[in-house]
């Protein structure tokens, strides 16, 4: 997995081992962000629920979003590691919550 566009383009994203997390495929994220680009993502606030790897939030920040919140019960440390690797951790808030209740 990697970041598709923006300032962190090409940076690898780590995923947790096992089947608990199914990261959004690169091509799916690319399609979503191509649509969002037409609506303007620059300066936006992003909420990434069930964030897993943090790839969606990190992709948004890489493409100019002002701030992102990543919510995931198990993978907060991994999300932070990925965000630091992509140099967007200063604009990312991680909330370790279980939302399935």
Q: Whereabouts are the PLM-identified features?
A:
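Class I S-adenosyl-L-methionine-dependent methyltransferase catalytic core
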Residues: 1-101
